């Protein structure tokens, strides 16, 4: 009875692994479809580049603004973009490990010197379990978010710098490089101290109303668009990471199925050989 029991066990494992393979394959195909639809990134990038050009033109004429000037740092804000779901390989863990405040000096920052703004349920759960100061969060965003979906948290985030709550603000997210490569990125969002260095004046504009009023309107919009652009970048990275993770899971499941099938065939052959041997032995005993 033992070989038969072993055959049943192997067959059960094969069927279970096949079902798992079907699920991971379906998830891979869904993620591939979502990645192919994540085309808003290019539109937003063009929009940000145009705002950059206009603002750099104004600022290069000697106009200053609080969002363009560094100040003594008493409190730092960290905007962290994660996903609402797992099964995406190291997508989330790479980001939260970068933010977890064992900074370069390997010392924990006092809670009153930093605060965290989280996009995504995975990051929110991670930081709350460690009693880290999360002051803003948003979850359950759609797979193809519009600016309206994050307008409120983007406005509040920029406002926390404008009102002096934060003296500097950093973003952490996964930057989409390709379907098989995503890079964990740390980007200084505010103040925009590198803004002028990265943008040389290209076009001469005539401004109406005053240049100061233009900066008051455009700089917050630009900072908010940077947050939205990072979110779209992170969403594309999430879909790519999940697609890759599910493909690897499907490939591994297929390898297991092949190994189990080989074991099943060998066990079945051994069982048949044993039965034939017993029949022949019984016949010889009767003679």
From Swiss-Prot:
Coiled coil: none annotated. One of its GO terms (biological process) is proton motive force-driven plasma membrane ATP synthesis. GO terms for cellular component: plasma membrane; proton-transporting ATP synthase complex. It is a peripheral membrane protein. It comes from the Bacteria. Keywords: ATP synthesis, Cell membrane, CF(1), Hydrogen ion transport, Ion transport, Membrane, Transport. GO terms for molecular function: ATP binding; proton-transporting ATP synthase activity, rotational mechanism. It is found in: Cell membrane. InterPro entries: ATP_synth_F1_ATPase_gsu, ATP_synth_F1_gsu. Transmembrane segments: none annotated. Belongs to the ATPase gamma chain family. F-type ATPases have 2 components, CF(1) - the catalytic core - and CF(0) - the membrane proton channel. CF(1) has five subunits: alpha(3), beta(3), gamma(1), delta(1), epsilon(1). CF(0) has three main subunits: a, b and c. NCBIfam families: ATPsyn_F1gamma. Produces ATP from ADP in the presence of a proton gradient across the membrane. The gamma chain is believed to be important in regulating ATPase activity and the flow of protons through the CF(0) complex. This is ATP synthase gamma chain. It comes from Geobacillus stearothermophilus (Bacillus stearothermophilus).
